[in-house]
């Protein structure tokens, strides 16, 4: 370790503007007014993780009538944190009870998103990236990147749009590096992780939410 003496110690700075910077980039990627005009009824399950606060802000900015569950970012997970069907029964039931148009489930660090349809049915995580790619390709032509464990749905969607998919080894960093090298317009992993370089070279459930609502 390199130790600093008392004169050269670093300083701790608190940045409270992270949500605003992040959400500004997300909102720039979609048509806020078009989404708001539809007045979507949304249930958001943030599993008491990091996505609760910015997730609720995003839905508010997009004019959604949102019901938030497990939205206290204590880190004490309300259910098993993996956003798979067996762990999202509360979300599915809430969508049905409230007559919501869609339900969204974030994982604890908010880089993955699972979707529940208007009937309370769980949509597999593989569909998150596929649906995001479908929307992006309809507006922007360019390559995509996905790891080798991701469904071929993205290949079929890309082919229909006349676009190419670059495959990478498993690992978010490998996908992100390929996207930056190939100037990809969308990318991610089949676990519900979508990467949009307009927001940043990382998986992000917030851009996923915005794109899915724009697609609806």
Predicted ranges, named:
Residues 44-47, 70, 106-108, 146, ...:
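Active-site flanking residues adjacent to catalytic metal/cofactor-binding acidic residues
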Residues 70-74, 127-130, 169-174, 191-192:
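Short, acidic/turn-prone active-site loops that include or flank metal/cofactor-
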Residues 101-102, 140-216:
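Phosphate-binding and adjacent anionic-ligand microenvironments
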Residues 1-98:
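Gly/Ser/Thr-enriched, mixed-charge loops and adjacent short helices
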Residues 24-27, 53-56, 60, 88-96, ...:
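Predominant activation on well-ordered alpha-helical scaffold segments within soluble catalytic domains
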Residues 53-57, 78-82, 113-118, 154-160, ...:
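Short acidic, glycine/serine/threonine-rich loops at helix termini
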